[in-house]
Structures are given as C-alpha cells and as structure tokens.
UniProtKB/Swiss-Prot annotation:
Origin: domain of life: Viruses
Keyword presence, Coiled coil: yes
InterPro entries named among the record's database cross-references: DUF5846
Pfam families registered for this protein in UniProt: DUF5846
Residues forming coiled coils: 37-62
Keyword tags: Coiled coil
Protein name: Uncharacterized protein R11
Coiled coil as UniProt keyword: yes
Amino acid sequence: MSKIFRKFAKTEFIFRFNIIDHNVILYSLYLDIIPMDSSNNYKKKYKKYKRKYIDLKKQLNYNQIHNFYFVHSTTNFSNLRDILKSGVIYPGKFLRPDQQKLSVNSEDVFANIYFEDINNLTHLQDFSILLHPKIIYDCGMFFNKGWQGGGKGDIIINATDSPVQIAHKLNEIREFLKNPILPEKIREFNPFLHHEAFFNHPISLNNGNLIGIICNHCDGSFNDYITGETHKESLKIINNIINDKLYNNVKIITRNYPIPKLNELLH
C-alpha cells in the first residue's frame, strides 16, 4: 500500500491507495490533524485543507467506482499448470512453442476485464487466472475495443495517472462494455472477443496479484478438448504446485459459472 505524504504547516495529509469494505478500488484522502497548538492560524489551515479533502471526494465521485477484476484465459490445463509453477504470466514471445497458442510473437499479456455490476462476460474459460484490479495502479493497462491483438490501445491507463484520470478511464471502459459499439458480426461472437485488456510486460502472481484460479471440473476426471488428454486428480496437482508459493491460499474454483464476485475472491 503506497503512501504519499504532503505536509502543509501543522497539517499532514495522507494520500493513500485503499481497498475498503466490498473491496471497491478507490483512492481516499485521509486528513490527519496534528494539534501542535491551538492558534487561529492553525484553525484556518485546518478549514482550508478540509475543504480540499471534500472537493477531491466530489471529483472522484465514489458512487461511480465499480468492482472489477482481470481474467487471463489459458487454452488448456497444461498451460494453467505451467503458469502456476513459474509464478509469472509471460508474453507469448517468451513462451515455448507448445505454450504459445494464439499469442505466438506477442510482446503483451492479454486479459479480459470483468465488471460484476454489468456482467459483461457470460462465463469464464475453463482454465483461467483471475487477477487483482490493483495491477493497473502498479503498471497501467492498455484497452482495445474488440479483440485486435494488441497495438497502441484505444484507451490507455498509465500508472502515473491521477486518481481522477484513472476513474474516468475505467468508467469509459465500463460504459463501452455495457453496450459495445462494434460491427454486428463481432457482437455475435463470444463476449470475450468484444474487448481486450493487455499489459506490455510479464505479470507476477505474487504480491496479491493472483486472486483466483478457474479449473473447470478439476474436482473430477475430465477430457481436455484442446489436447485430447484425460486429466485425473487435477485439483490435487494444482494444490501441490501452489503449496510452497506465496499464493497458496488462493481460491481454486472448479466451475466456470457462475462468475465469482471480487468480494468472494478476496475473503
């Protein structure tokens, strides 16, 4: 959790990234008064900076901030297993040929963004990695309308953006996902193809970034329709892999529907 301290005379403002209650991502400004004396000058400064605090809250418009997280889909159980072993999601160009699938020479890590209040995804893919929304504050994000395979990004969130800028861009993304303006043929496709979120660097599963693992029907025997392999005791395999990892307490979900809520994943 990062803190930026700004001192104004005898008043200290703590500008803090915080996740509260229902784990809604937001920024909050805490006013911490240090009563060094009781002079009128001090009281004036208190009132002045209290107004700044209230104004910032109004700018952020907290009621417009919604629960969301990222979904990185893998094509089969083997790829899911390899990611959990390494603890890192790598761009396609850094993977072995048998791992690359749709991202052969890509320098980006791709994902979908799921806003739970608009249910913009109908289900999750059979083998998926669920990522904490805080990663956009750590390293930014690119967003494309439709699945374009990377590029410059239709909407870019920089890690250096202000809280207000990030909130506005997230709201723009959410409004698009509520009613994607895309060619009709694309809109008929799986909602996973209506957009892409991507990152131009590997993503670590540590530091609380990994919040969930989807392994559909891994609590029993299943056939991988991509590889044709029959997998048994897959849940046990996953538990053994993550046993010595920092994310060993992450939730493993064995059905790809209903889609879990952020609050369920973090508690």
